[in-house]
Curated annotation (Swiss-Prot):
GO terms for cellular component: cytosol; membrane. Carrier of the growing fatty acid chain in fatty acid biosynthesis. GO terms for molecular function: acyl binding; acyl carrier activity. Residues 2-77 form the Carrier domain. The modification O-(pantetheine 4'-phosphoryl)serine is found at residue 37. HAMAP family: Acyl_carrier. This is Acyl carrier protein. It comes from Blochmanniella pennsylvanica (strain BPEN).
Length: 83
């Protein structure tokens, strides 16, 4: 498991108050992990802070699963490295 994946899963677990084992890549924040809209906003803010990146609102709306969060952060880091 990559460092980004581990960090994202840890943040999700802490923010949503769920066990680390429940935070699997295909899990939906709302349907599988019990998040509400405020939880998802706070989660996006925590990811932005941890990874020192900005997630535009239109992108944040698309991040509905653990894998989507991992993919966004990974892609964001790749772009930052190439700049």
């Amino acid at each position: 498991m990559s460092t980004i994946e581990e960090k994202v899963k840890t943040i999700i677990s802490e923010q949503l108050g769920v066990k680390q084992e429940e935070v699997v890549n295909h899990a939906s924040f709302v349907e599988d992990l019990g998040a509400d809209s405020l939880d998802t906003v706070e989660l996006v803010m925590a990811l932005e802070e941890e990874f020192d990146t900005e997630i535009p609102d239109e992108e944040a709306e698309k991040i509905t699963t653990v894998q989507a969060a991992i993919d966004f952060i990974s892609n964001s880091h790749q772009q930052n490295k190439s700049n």
